[in-house]
Amino acid sequence: MTNDTQTTNTETTDTYIPSPSDWVREQVETIEATGDTRSVDIMGLPVVLLTMRGKKTGALRKVPLMRVEHDGVYAAVASKGGAPEHPQWYANLLANPTLTLMDGTASWDAVAREITGEEREQWWARCVQAFPNYAEYQTNTDRTIPVLLLEPVSAG
């Protein structure tokens, strides 16, 4: 089988590349089979599904994340369980901030934007309220865990 299409950082492809992580891949497969993010959870808590473009390949990448929502805006917390490095999806969203967000059976286009300062502090409190382990994750790493807002793209 040959691949006649090559992709650079600025090109995109509709090819979906599953995660190398077993649990991520299995959760994505379950969500896609059921058409509903409520078919899976992380530690008993609800998730949303982000579909984005890979930074290096431009291919579609999918990741389930903890559901943190306030007034129709969602947050994505790049905690990676308090690991010393950021998750790959964070680099993907910085490079290609447009994404599709799925919550339950609904999905829509959104744009990711990293937040800092007072805005981050306000959202960080919401994130910790939604998933208290985030506070512990922050104490386990020297990096400031990034928070990105996933703001809906208005139609029109």
PLM feature spans:
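Extreme N-terminal tail/first-helix region
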Residues: 1-43
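Accessory terminal regions of nucleic-acid processing enzymes
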Residues: 3, 150, 156
